[in-house]
Amino acid sequence: ILVIASLPTSNFAKTLDYISDMFPVKDRAEAKTLLAESVQAILSQMLCHSVEGGRAICREVLLRAEGVPTAIRENNIAALRQIMDSYRQQGMRTLDFSLRELLATGKITASEAYARATDKRQFQHFLVGY
C-alpha cells in the first residue's frame, strides 16, 4: 500500500500529532500503534527566506529504522530526533539540521534559521558562531 498525503504540518512531530488528532480521544492509543507499525517515511519541508531574495527549501526526513516504531507508539519526540541524527548517513535529517546546513552555506540568515528552528534552545547554541 502506498499512501501519499499532503498535510498542513511543518515537521514530523506535528504530522504525527495531526494524524493522531484525527481519531476520537478513546482511539488515539490504538491509532498511534497502527501508525507506528505502518509508517515507512515522513517527509516535511518548508520554504525559508533566502539571502538572495528568493526561497530556500528546508527538508526533514524520518525513515523507518530500529527504534522508530517504539518512539512513535510512545510519542517520544526526543528519541525520534536522536534516531534521525544517528541515521543521517542513511538519509534521515531533522529540520534543525537542514537549517544549520542552509545557514552554513550562506543561503539563509541566522535570524531566519532561528525563527524556523524547532528546538530553539539547542539551536541557539549552534548560533554562537554566527
Give the positions of each predicted feature.
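Short, flexible helix-loop junctions that flank or precede catalytic/ligand sites
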Residues: I1-Y130
